[in-house]
Design a protein with these regions (language model features):
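Histidine-rich, glycine-flanked metal-binding segment
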Residues: 2-6, 13-57
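Divalent metal-coordination and catalytic microenvironments
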Residues: 11, 31, 51, 62, ...
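Acidic, glycine-enriched loop/beta-strand segments at the rims
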Residues: 14-25, 407-415, 421, 465-470, ...
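Di-metal (Zn2+ and/or Mg2+/Mn2+) metal-binding site signature of metallo-dependent hydrolases
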Residues: 54-77
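Active-site neighborhoods of metal-dependent hydrolases
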Residues: 135, 143-144, 150-157, 163, ...
Length: 555
């Protein structure tokens, strides 16, 4: 369909403001909403939306689609879940600025932190740019979805300081150079800056942003606001609560010094802190100080899949396991099968700490050999007891029989208390976000949280009203993130819209598919119930799947 003229008739309109739904038509011309109500004019293209919900397109504020947008301008499967705008470049990582040779370090950080592999980069990410603006120019022509792109603090630091970016504080001159890059990037269309207090690189050394002082962060945030907008996104040191609370306080200082909106994720419900009480109290303290600091929370359980053929953050805490997981697949198989190495691996698994301590909570998912069929759906602790084996031995025996492809699942542990999750989703101290879509792709699919919210929390359990859910996914984040030209169905706003059947909308189980460049695999979550997704006036997805429209913009 052309974006020149379109009318959607007889819709139940949920306009994003939080008011009650109302019936009406919406007319679009040249990508802009022209009329709402009883549209009498005849348009080139018309959609009958009787019995369907028409809402603003959803905004996903935490994604890592930076590489994927080089070959997939739809950021699949985001659009089929009603998402019309994604924010990329989170957690201090972006693909620009970059100097010749600098891509190797960027790739290695993306591999470890975001689980996007080097063969994928080699096959589909050309690194034909240097500046952030040049990267945006590279992805623009192919966009079917809107992109709000953050500049990665680690990328900027690496560009200016090289190897020293992971050794020391920046000098005043280096800070000025970084600020100049941020200003120029913002002028080229960037949305803000991202940083990290917790991430590590391929050598388990802190990423460049973690070597910055508060002065550097404040100056970069101030540079980002010179265009009249800007956000400062971080991932805190969530491993230790005391440190995380200090991070939140520093965000408050940055906001108060510069006026920038600061945001961090994830804020999750855990068994020992169902409503994230300490974090929410820290957020309230900063709000009381006058700082603009928001958490990000999500509706789904934070479930993880582990395959020894891929990557797993559950193994990072065990050095021998981690070292073997870093090997090419053929060497990895030999190492895991080696009797002497197995003794070390089994001992490490017995004494696992951090995220690796969750290994006993795993159960067996998909299997690929006949002998492993008896284990499907069973918890590893159950198998250990039945067979008299240690946890490490059970994992190795099962995985080796499947050529390392066995799926081990960690489910219903984090963010599983639905009452507490409802509280967090509804709390004004948090934004709806933290999906991590486009990252950790061999461990989970972050895309689809929008559909899960509608299906479970709005329709099935009625814990959240439809108007409130839509408002939280659209106008609220659009306003706070500086996307003032969209996020609401109003005359003169961008025609980013989603049409769906609330009685049919739903999400599939995760599927492990092999569709990434470089023969890489990823988890996907498919949707149902979406009749049309419209980006800047053009239908990019309908009942027949994706169209050929490329109407996305840098926002």
């Amino acid at each position: 369909m052309s974006q020149n003229s379109l009318v959607i008739r007889n819709a139940t309109i949920v306009d994003g403001t939080g008011i009650e739904p109302f019936k009406g038509d919406v007319a679009i011309e040249n990508g802009i909403i022209k009329e709402i109500g009883n549209v009498e004019d005849i348009y080139n293209n018309e959609i009958d939306a009787k019995g369907k919900i028409l809402a603003p397109g959803f905004i996903d504020i935490h994604t890592h689609f930076d590489p994927q947008l080089c070959w997939d301008g739809y950021a699949t499967p985001s659009i089929e879940h009603g998402v019309t705008t994604v924010v990329t470049g989170n957690c201090s990582l972006s693909l620009a600025p970059i100097k010749n040779g600098g891509q190797d370090k960027i790739i290695s950080m993306f591999q470890v932190i975001e689980d996007i592999k080097k063969p994928t980069f080699d096959a589909a990410v050309p690194f034909s740019w240097e500046t952030f603006g040049e990267y945006l120019d590279h992805i623009k022509p192919n966009l079917g979805i809107n992109v709000g792109a953050l500049i990665g603090h680690s990328a900027v630091r690496l560009y200016v300081m090289g190897e020293d970016s992971q050794k020391r504080k920046a000098t005043d001159e280096e800070i000025r150079e970084m600020c100049d890059i941020v200003e120029k990037s913002m002028e080229s269309g960037a949305l803000g800056v991202s940083s990290s207090y917790v991430d590590v690189d391929e050598n388990f050394d802190p990423v460049p942003s973690r070597f910055s002082c508060k002065k550097e962060k404040i100056e970069l945030a101030r540079a980002a606001t010179k265009t009249g907008r800007g956000v400062w996104q971080v991932v805190p040191y969530f491993i230790d609560m005391e440190t995380q609370l200090k991070n939140i306080e520093e965000l408050g200082d940055i906001s108060l010094e510069t006026g920038i909106m600061c945001t961090f994720q994830p804020v999750l419900s855990t068994p020992d802190a169902p409503k994230a009480e300490q974090i929410m109290a820290a957020l309230q303290k900063e709000r009381d100080r006058g700082a603009k600091v928001f958490g990000q929370t999500m509706p789904r359980c934070f479930d993880l899949n582990m395959r020894l053929s891929e990557t797993s953050m559950l193994l990072f805490g065990m050095p021998t396991w981690k070292a073997i997981m870093d090997l090419p697949i053929d060497e990895r198989k030999k190492s895991f099968a080696d009797n002497e190495k197995q003794k070390i691996l089994i001992e490490e698994a017995k004494n696992a700490q951090g995220m690796s301590a969750a290994l006993p909570m795993l159960k067996v998912g998909d299997v690929y050999s006949k002998q492993n069929e008896i284990y499907k759906g069973k918890y590893l602790v159950e198998i250990c007891e039945t067979e008299g084996k240690d946890i490490g031995q059970v994992i190795l025996d099962i995985a080796l029989a499947d050529d390392l492809k066995t799926e081990f699942q960690l489910m219903d542990v984090i963010n599983s208390d639905k009452e507490s999750v409802s509280y967090l989703i509804m709390n004004e101290l948090c934004h709806f976000g933290a999906s991590d879509a486009g990252a950790h792709i061999t461990q989970f699919c972050g895309t689809g949280d929008t559909t899960h919210l509608l299906e479970h929390y709005v329709r099935d359990t009625k814990k959240i009203s439809l108007s409130t859910a839509i408002h939280r996914m659209t106008q609220e984040v659009a306003n706070d993130w500086g996307l003032h030209d969209r996020g609401v169905i109003q005359n003169g706003k961008a025609a980013d819209l989603v049409l769906f059947d609330i009685n049919e909308v739903g999400i599939s189980k995760e599927a492990f598919v092999n569709d990434f460049p470089g023969e890489a695999s990823r988890y996907m979550r498919y949707s149902k119930g979406y009749e049309a997704v419209i980006v800047n006036g053009s239908v990019v997805y309908d009942n027949n799947g994706y169209t050929d429209a490329r109407s996305g913009k840098i926002v």
